Amino acid sequence: QERYGFKYLCADERNELAKVGADFIQSYQSKVPFLLVLSFINPHDICFVMPSKTRPPFEKAYKREPEIKMAVDSLSRIADSMPVGFFETDASAPLPKNLQPTVNNIYDNGRLISDKTDSEWRRYIWMYHRMVEIVDAQIGKVLDALDKSPLKDNTIVIMTSDHGEMRGSHQMIGKNIQYEEAQRVPLIFAGRGIKKGMDDKSVICNVWDLLPTMCEMASIANVPNYEGISLYGLVTEGKPLLKRDYIYLESLQSYQIIKQGRYKYTVREASGLPCMFTDLKVDSLETMNLIEKPQYQDVITELKVILDEELEHRQIVLDENGWRNSKGRVK
C-alpha cells in the first residue's frame, strides 16, 4: 500500500482473483466508498499459443511466469482431444473474413504469420474463445457476489480492456497494430444511474476517459489538465459528446493515427509506404489501403493537418531513429 497508494489484493490474475474480488464485496462493511479494480489477465494468454517463424520463442515468458505455460498447455490438451477433422471447418471456429493481408499494406514488418493453415488458425481462434469463456465465468462470480450484496444498489460496474486481439485478421495476432481488431475494446457501464438499453458503437472515446468519468460519478475533482473527457452524461442520460470529433492513437509499433468517424489515417516510421488511409464505411475490414485514391485526397489532407497539430502539441518528431519526444523514443 505504501508503494502504490492502494491495497494490492492478489497477484494471481488467472485463478484466484475472482474469488478475492467476490470475497471483498461480500465482506465489505465500511460506509466509506471504495474503488475495486480487478485486472483479469485473460484472454491475454492467447499470445502464447501460436509459435511462428516471425515470432520469438515463448520460453522466456514461460520461465518468467510458469502460470502462462500451465494455462496454455491445459487448453492445448483439450484442443488436441477434439475429434479428427474438428478444425477443418468453420463449425469449430469461423475464420475472419479478412484473414488475408491488406492490399498495399504498410504493416508487414515481420508481423504477418503466413506459415499457418486454415485449420491451425481455427484452432487458435477456438482456444481464444475458450479463454474468453473462462474470464467470462470469473467476472460472473464477482457479479454474482455483488448481486447478493447490500452494495448492489449503490455500485457502478465498468468493464473494459487495454487492447483487442487480431485473432487472425490480416494474418496477424496480438496487439500494437493499427487495425480495428486490436484497437477497439468493450466499454460497458452498469449499475445505479446508468441508462439501460443503450448500445452505441459510434462514440469517439478511449480509456483516457475513464478517470474523468469515474470522478464525475463519485462527485470528486478530476486531475487538472487531463486529456480525457467525462462520459457521465452519455452513460446516464444518453447525451452526445460535444468536445471531440476525432481521436489520436499511437503504439509501441511506432504508428500514429488520426481516426475521425469513418476515416482513419495512419503513419508509420518504418515501412515502404509513408502512410495508410481507410474508409471504414466502404471497407470495414480494412482490406485496402486507399491512400492514393483521388476521391479521398481532400480528407487525407485534412487528417494530415490534424495529425501534425497533435504531434506538435505532444512535441513528437520523426527522425532517423523513429518517433521521439522530449523524453526519448515514443513507446
What residue ranges belong to the model's regions?
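Non-transmembrane alpha-helical segments in soluble domains
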Residues: 22-26, 129-132, 136-143, 147, ...
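Active-site-proximal cap/lid insertion segments
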Residues: 27-32, 40-154, 158-204, 217-220, ...
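Structural motif
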Residues: 33-35, 182, 262, 275
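Hydrophobic/aromatic beta-strand patches that form the interior of the parallel beta-sheet core
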Residues: 36, 156-158, 266, 278
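Long, internal low-complexity/basic segments
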Residues: 51, 98-123, 131, 135, ...
